[in-house]
């Protein structure tokens, strides 16, 4: 059984630490900074870092990769279509990778970057998703490289995963995302309740993650483009009717970019 903990980095990044407590082996996801991982390993000298998983090429996700590989000899697994430092295993849609005895399916989710991938395991005991900067808690990443035609289907695909799937995204953006979700759906009681819950967590300096796919379906406007009120708000923002899920998504994303 794998334990998952967050190692905070920079101002709002999370490096996810996967731990096989029986074998004292661990892996990390998107180590943008080596220092938090180095500190953990120094405090736990009996542990071995075996794998580094990377979702995309942005420096706040890969900045610590080469240092950690040099220190530990860990295998670096990342997207085939992006330049990932120290990469040993190039991964693309449909590939599978075994990490700490867990098999992860690789999902291509372009949009934030063109080669962005996510890692999904259906368990046991619980399905987990490492979504990088594609799906956030109550939000999604900006489209730095991709298009709405790429990103909306990618998000819809993640939304179709089992509702109990735990979502481990890479940033603590939940509260600001929920402020936007409240503007899009002011009458959504699930959004309001989540906003209150996350406000309490952050006031106590506690993290708001993981989320679940089920919770995202209820509260994430970027997964709710078929909802009448969401479409109406997107139409108001653009000043015309958006006639497809992609168009509604594009309107929401452009609104959020300036929110």
From Swiss-Prot:
Keyword DNA-binding: no
Gene encoding the protein: gloB
Protein's name in the database: Hydroxyacylglutathione hydrolase
Homology family: Belongs to the metallo-beta-lactamase superfamily. Glyoxalase II family.
Entry keyword annotation includes Phosphoprotein: no
Known role: Thiolesterase that catalyzes the hydrolysis of S-D-lactoyl-glutathione to form glutathione and D-lactic acid.
Organism from which the protein derives: Pseudomonas putida (strain GB-1)
Pfam family membership, one: Lactamase_B
Quaternary data: Monomer.
InterPro entries xrefs: Clx_II_MBL (IPR035680), Glyoxalase_II_hydrolase (IPR050110), HAGH_C (IPR032282), Hydroxyacylglutathione_Hdrlase (IPR017782), Metallo-B-lactamas (IPR001279), RibonucZ/Hydroxyglut_hydro (IPR036866)
E.C. number: 3.1.2.6
Record text on cofactor binding: Binds 2 Zn(2+) ions per subunit.
Entry keyword set: Hydrolase, Metal-binding, Zinc
Cofactor: Zn(2+)
Biological process according to GO: methylglyoxal catabolic process to D-lactate via S-lactoyl-glutathione
Residues involved in Zn(2+) 2 binding: 60-61, 133, 171
């Amino acid at each position: 059984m794998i334990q998952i903990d967050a190692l905070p980095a920079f101002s709002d990044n999370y490096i996810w630490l996967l731990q096989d407590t029986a074998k004292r082996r661990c892996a990390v996801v998107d180590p943008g900074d080596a220092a938090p991982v180095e500190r953990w390993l120094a405090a736990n000298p009996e542990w071995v870092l075996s794998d580094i998983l990377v979702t995309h090429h942005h420096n706040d996700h890969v900045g610590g990769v080469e240092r950690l590989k040099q220190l530990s000899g860990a295998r670096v697994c990342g997207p085939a279509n992006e330049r990932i430092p120290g990469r040993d295993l190039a991964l693309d849609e449909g590939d599978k990778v075994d990490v700490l005895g867990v098999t992860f399916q690789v999902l291509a989710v372009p949009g934030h970057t063109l080669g962005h991938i996510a890692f999904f395991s259906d368990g046991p005991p619980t399905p987990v998703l490492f979504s990088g900067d594609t799906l956030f808690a109550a939000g999604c990443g900006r489209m730095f490289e991709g298009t709405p035609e790429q990103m909306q289907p990618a998000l819809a695909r993640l939304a179709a995963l089992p509702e109990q799937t735990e979502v481990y995204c890479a940033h603590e953006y939940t509260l600001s995302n929920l402020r936007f979700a409240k503007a899009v759906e002011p009458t959504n009681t699930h959004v309001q309740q989540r906003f209150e819950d996350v406000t309490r967590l952050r006031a106590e300096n506690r993290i708001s993650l993981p989320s679940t796919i089920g919770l995202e379906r209820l509260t994430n406007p970027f997964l709710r483009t078929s909802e009448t009120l969401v479409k109406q708000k997107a139409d108001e923002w653009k000043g015309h009717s958006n006639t497809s899920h992609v168009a509604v998504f594009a309107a929401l994303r452009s609104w959020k970019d300036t929110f």
